[in-house]
Amino acid sequence: LSKGFNIIERFSEDIDLAISHSFFGIEKTDKSQREKLRKISRAYIHETLSAQLDANLKEVGVSGYTIENVSQVQDKEGKWRPIDSDKDPTVILLHYPSILEDTINYIPPRVKIEISCLSMDEPTELRQIRSLIGESFDGEDTDADSLARTVVPTRTFLEKLFLLAEEFQKEKPRSVRMSRHLYDLAKLMDTEYGVEALSNRTLYDAIVEHRKAYYALKYVNYDLHAPSTINFTIPESVIGAWQDDYTDMKRFFIYGESLEFEA
């Protein structure tokens, strides 16, 4: 939304990438096939893509970094345990030494790469991507210019609606780094993409069916995603935490005009 379409003015939480499930030769969506797809994808990403990333960085002269294939997660008691082998998305962290004396906990010195094998293939389009340095200074960082196949904002708008609706079906919804989705929706709402998203029932239903088939979250009632019943309003029990998170977002992530939380 920021680099490809210039709709939002904030830093990204991560780099979201997708590998088509057809790449692994799996098309079916039953439970056993989903688990097989996730396991194959995780192994490929951590064993092959991670090594390719390391080799490519070394080839262009980058040094001083470390690559971490994330294989553990911290539970509610603070204990670390192995991530399930069929967990999606798969995460790679690229840690780098910051040139700043003081770092911010909200923005750790790392690049977080999330790669999913469950995403829809369409609709997407090719977009020109430039770095912030390249956009700000003529002739600088031109080597970073590239064409990337990117999800169209119409689909992103709907996926964020469903993501929030699903999150708020949890008994204890998350809040840290989650308010960015509300900011994105607010910025998208009045664009042509937001208008189209709310009028394209075919795409709306296709995304719901895809999420139901490929994610099949046990705590989600996908029937509630119908336009007449979808609810992405922040529950009263966590609204304070979401407001605190948005305060951090405005301070550390949003570099353009920030919207008011209660607007």
Predicted feature locations:
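Structured mid-to-C-terminal alpha-helical surface segments
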Residues: 5-10, 21-263
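Glycine-rich beta-strand-to-loop/alpha-helix junction loops that act as flexible
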Residues: 1
